[in-house]
């Protein structure tokens, strides 16, 4: 905990997290509360990890403690939701994240049904590569399935892009213009005589990055 304040102000830090409970121990509770206070102090969004076991109980506890420490629900993304937790998370004003894994947690088909039932507001579809079998294309594959299932394009964009941008953009460190109108790349330039290149690498010179919307 002593080191975290040294990093939260660095460029590109968009949230504190994932933080929260897994086994729901006293130690987890202690540090969860300390990290919530840090997030409040530096005015950053919070990304909450909900436990694998007793998920509903742990999710409710996570929100209760967050509110106890005075965090605004709109600044908090509660991740790894399922059918048991999503209604209460949304009803209480939080962002509800859903992690898509190929064979566990949340399949694309189930995600489609959740968006159909609850709509696109404050729902964030994401993927992960932290353990087990993962798929870096899980989000676009889920978007394609939503499209085939008749979900409006505007709703698909919200749950796979815009809601995450809105939530994490509250940090002041995330602006889509950074990639829509990215500066040209020129690795021949040096800063105070120093180059980013190492070991005889060939410098790259490119125009502005292209961002393609489907």
Segments and roles (model prediction):
Residues 18, 39, 96, 128, ...:
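Conserved, mostly hydrophobic/aromatic
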Residues 84-85, 110:
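Short acidic active-site motifs
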Residues 86-93:
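Short loop/helix-cap segments at secondary-structure boundaries that form the rim of catalytic
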Residues 118-136, 156:
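Short acidic/histidine-rich active-site segments
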Residues 140, 144-214:
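Mid-to-C-terminal alpha-helical segments outside catalytic/metal-binding sites
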